[in-house]
Regions:
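The catalytic-center signature of Zn2+-dependent metalloproteases
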Residues: 232-255, 301-374, 378
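Divalent metal-coordination and catalytic microenvironments
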Residues: 92, 217, 277, 330, ...
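N-terminal prosegments of processed precursors
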Residues: 21-130, 254-258, 381
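Bacterial N-terminal signal peptides that target proteins for export
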Residues: 1-8
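Short, solvent-exposed loop/turn and secondary-structure capping segments
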Residues: 126-127, 287-292, 341
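Active-site-proximal beta-strand/loop segments in catalytic clefts of secreted hydrolases
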Residues: 94, 106-107, 116-118, 127, ...
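N-terminal signal peptide c-region/cleavage motif recognized by signal peptidases
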Residues: 16-18
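Fold-level signature of zinc-dependent metallopeptidase catalytic domains
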Residues: 21-42, 135-303, 316-319
Length: 382
């Protein structure tokens, strides 16, 4: 892989998330029936310092689920800063299914997250943060998430149409020397940043919102790339008028990425990490003014003091925001877009996570995994 590739290469993922209900719909979803969480207080009284393993059981989609969960220590440092310590990230698997992985955040007794059962990805979404707009916690297959044609496209071209394809696309692009399992053998520290616009949307829950998204990203990367995501730092800027504030009022995605890179370069608490990722509440746009852009990142930029940066919009729901972030972090890891002319993965035609348009897949293609494996092998911070 070229040693200078990261200097100028960046890639943008785009889709219209400003009015998510208009761009994503579900052909089927169900509430969680007979939900029980044992080993932790469902009223949120369990504290981070004493959090232990839990079992989560429920019925849905014609089957019974038994989730075996342990606190996700990679994210607990960030979680300790949350008010009341009632937000706990968990990782684990389905009982008796070693090819599965689970990432769940339990906030005030309410679960949300992702389940990979060995063949398909399932999303659990809480009231107020689910695609269906339901007033209860729901579960659905990502394959049942329908994306409006043309609403999720990238400047590099291409469009995809369902949620299952987004995961498949991501995994296909990351997937060679890795196994579908809950564990990971290496790790990378990712510094998380939120701008004032993100804080304006999520308010006091901004850190919780970032934590939930990164817990899902960790599931994807741990299982498919063999690299776990550690989060030693979450910085939430709440006032754009208070100095020092690193971002201008620009909504141009490339310009905002440059500002993030400058901030990372000059901030020791960020550049000590392998990567920095910004969640923005802005409706960012491309150089041509296309506001369907939702993410951008430097490609092949692991461990780079300035260029180890990427950003994604945090204006949608947790599941799809996490897929966007995973896509952009995939670029940081060296994965180009699948099926794009003159790309190293130009011949990849499936619906995978690194397709130029969000499609509901969380799977990296084999080509993506091969490309990332090269960068991982050379990365000093992994």
């Amino acid at each position: 892989m070229s040693g200078v590739r990261w200097l100028a290469a960046w890639a943008a993922l785009s889709f219209s998330m400003a009015v998510q209900a208009a761009t994503i719909s579900l052909s089927h979803h169900e509430p969680l029936q007979r939900l029980s969480i044992s080993g932790a207080s469902v009223d949120g009284s369990q504290k981070i310092g004493v959090a232990g393993p839990v079992e989560m059981n429920f019925d849905a989609l014609g089957r019974s689920f038994e989730l075996q969960l342990s606190p996700n220590g990679r994210l607990l440092d960030a979680a300790r800063d949350l008010a009341g310590n009632s937000v706990i990230p968990y990782r684990g698997k389905l009982a008796g299914n070693d090819s599965s992985w689970v990432r769940i955040v339990i906030a005030d007794g309410v679960p949300s997250g992702l389940i990979w059962d060995g063949s398909e990805l399932l999303a659990i979404e809480r009231p107020g943060d689910n695609v269906a707009g339901a007033d209860s916690t729901i579960i659905y297959r990502l394959a049942d998430a329908i994306i409006a044609p043309g609403s999720m496209s990238c400047g590099a071209g291409g469009s995809l149409s369902n949620g299952g394809a987004v995961y498949k696309s991501l995994v296909s692009e990351l997937n060679a020397a890795t196994a579908q399992a809950e564990g990971a053998v290496t790790q990378i520290d990712v510094g998380a940043v939120a701008d004032a616009e993100f804080a304006g949307i999520h308010g006091a829950n901004s850190q919780q919102a970032i934590l939930a998204r990164l817990n899902n990203v960790d599931g994807i990367f741990s299982a498919q790339v063999g690299v776990q995501i550690n989060v030693p730092l979450v910085q939430v800027f709440t006032d754009s008028g208070a100095a020092p504030y690193p971002f201008s009022g620009t909504v141009n995605a490339g310009n905002l990425l440059d500002e993030l890179a400058d901030y990372r370069n000059g901030e020791p608490n960020q550049n000590v990490n392998g990567l920095t990722h910004l969640w923005t509440g802005k409706d960012v746009e491309s150089d041509t003014g296309n506001n369907s852009t939702v993410g951008i990142a430097f490609t092949g930029a692991l461990c780079r003091q300035r260029f180890g940066a990427g950003l994604s919009e945090g204006r949608g729901n947790t599941t799809f925001d996490a897929l966007v972030a995973a896509h952009e972090i995939g670029h940081n890891f060296g994965a180009p877009h699948d099926g794009t002319s003159n790309s190293a993965c130009e011949s990849e035609t499936g619906d995978f996570l690194m397709a130029p348009s969000l499609n509901g897949s969380d799977q990296f293609s084999q080509c993506s995994l091969d490309q990332m494996a090269d960068d991982i092998a050379q990365a000093s911070c992994i």
